[in-house]
Amino acid sequence: VTGCGSNADDAKNDTQASKASESETSANADQEAAMHVADLIDAIYVQERTDDTDKQCKEAKEAWDKLTDAQKELVEGENADPDYFGRDTGDASKDDPRNQDDIGENEILVVSFGTSFNDSRVADIKGVEDAIAAANPDWSVRRAFTAQIIINHVQARDDEKIDNMDQALERAVKNGVKNLVVQPTHLMHGAEYDELSETVEKYKDKFESVKIAEPLLGEVGSDATVVNEDKKAVAEILTEEAVEKAGYDSLDAAKEEGTAFVFMGHGTSHTAKISYSQMQSQMTDLGYENVFIGTVEGEPEDTSCESVI
């Protein structure tokens, strides 16, 4: 009887061991599949476009689509995570990459850093491009992003191809554009604006005329007290909008209730960081005593979150 019992126990143990082994094998397979996709995502999470970029974007999405829901949750790499393909950022079909040919002789190239959030891209970047097109009916408006990482993300996830700077300028040359205006959507004369200008300089001789517009805040100025009409316009519009959205009749009314408005920038180590201090000077010049300019990364120091608070 004991022997029979032992055989039954052994069989039960063997079955449990077999199931455990199968479970471990399945888990390992899931992890390997997820790691493969993570590697493919990390391969396109780069700032340089190569001859293999289009192929890599396609491969990454196809591999993601083959994963089970459980496997997708395991995707994790240096930059890869489940949100890269899995997060819903809106309907990409509502966007217009503005990468068409048939440009004509006059082109306005709107250059943005870019965003992979579809709803934001449609409302903000496309909104600016559409407004520029409406105001300049005799000019063709095209788009370029400076962030290849974002271009790759949108292409891989949504199959929407957006030109980088070189692609957009080469397209302009190929289409026989004579007069080119480059309109950045950048905030100020930072590193992105410098790189933009350097890229345009390489193509300067390909056109009869090339003009690069100022960023939103205009020229930088020599010190923190120097302001300009661009900064004034931005300060007035931002403050008016913020006061209205906060439900106050005026900035003074908000002040009486002890309410302050803080406009946050990213912050930068670039020499253009003085622009943040200049915007604070502009707010002060306008008499906006309860309006402050802050920076997330704390450069310049006088606009760091701690200083503002």
PLM feature spans:
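Active-site-proximal alpha-helix that buttresses catalytic centers in soluble enzyme cores
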Residues: N79, D83-I309
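C-terminal motif of bacterial Sec signal peptides marking the signal peptidase cleavage site
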Residues: T2-G3
